[in-house]
From Swiss-Prot:
Domain of life: Bacteria
Protein name in UniProt: tRNA-specific adenosine deaminase
Subunit (UniProt): Homodimer.
Gene (name only): tadA
Ranges annotated as spanning the membrane: none
Amino acid sequence: MKSNRDSYWMKIALKYAYYAEENGEVPIGAILVFQEKIIGTGWNSVISQNDSTAHAEIIALREAGRNIKNYRLVNTTLYVTLQPCMMCCGAIINSRIKRLVFGASYKDLKKNPFLKKIFINLEKNKLKIKKHIMRNECAKILSNFFKNKRF
């Protein structure tokens, strides 16, 4: 059953989110899967890399591209613990990823107005999307992280 596999892969993405948190980053993790194998992994690394584009999704896509020697990541599924931002959505679409599975949505983060503004409507593209796999767990790590930060 696909839902069980989605949970399996999301648990791995969550491990990368926890790693990001342990390193003082916003806790977001991502993995890219092709034919039941992980071809790319990433965790948010904006602070440590001094790079505003070092989002978990972007890092996973870059690694996958290097691994398969192609930027076209067709027939892959991206698992990410938070609904992708506008920048990451563009990369997902340009990479030709077939399927996106995310855990928490911006709504889960208490309707943060900043986050709400940067989401793009992915449903208008050919990307198949499955939402809210392990939603509570994915939202919890982010909510706890932001409780301890002052913005």
